[in-house]
């Protein structure tokens, strides 16, 4: 078994608005190994996106903790969490969230700029990642000049440009047609094999989830089962 990279212990998330209390996550516990490809499957409203926000340090659990590489996130300052997200985690969303006035190359380079890398390193690494996703020839195009599949590939290159140990992906193919969705998942698998990056993908699509090496099911804020989807039709 691979060394545990990320572990969540009894995560709970509760929102309070006036006298109304909403429990979104209930005692969620699981781990992700180094280099693992894992899917969490569930319908809209099951708590998947809230869980990813907690795992990425974008929100704080009501109780429980997230442990990344042996270090509890609850003990990290806001600045330390920001550094962790920049250096060790990558994020891919259903919508690409590319900056519209910047080229593909500039969008991919953004995490390196934030991390204050050297200019020569920034340019070469961003180009390297665009090449890895098959878009080096589109480096100087803005998002409006790219197709939906190309924009999502740029977003993936951006997520991986700092060579993160784990990428958190929230419905990464949700806005794509079947052909582009298939292409994106093939790309994630290839990057996992080449770079050893771990991926945790949340999705409602069983056909896409079955491509991951491990699948968990989430319902009403609870992990209910470990699925066996390999080869499922």
UniProtKB/Swiss-Prot annotation:
- Name the keywords, alphabetized: ATP-binding, Cell inner membrane, Cell membrane, Membrane, Nucleotide-binding, Translocase, Transport
- The entry's ATP-binding residues are 42-49
Q: Which terms in the GO cellular component ontology are assigned?
A: plasma membrane
> Which EC class heads this enzyme's classification?
translocase
* Protein EC: 7.6.2.-
Q: What does this protein do?
A: Part of the ABC transporter complex LolCDE involved in the translocation of mature outer membrane-directed lipoproteins, from the inner membrane to the periplasmic chaperone, LolA. Responsible for the formation of the LolA-lipoprotein complex in an ATP-dependent manner.
Recorded family membership: Belongs to the ABC transporter superfamily. Lipoprotein translocase (TC 3.A.1.125) family.
Query: What is the recorded name of this protein?
Result: Lipoprotein-releasing system ATP-binding protein LolD
Species source reads Shigella sonnei (strain Ss046)
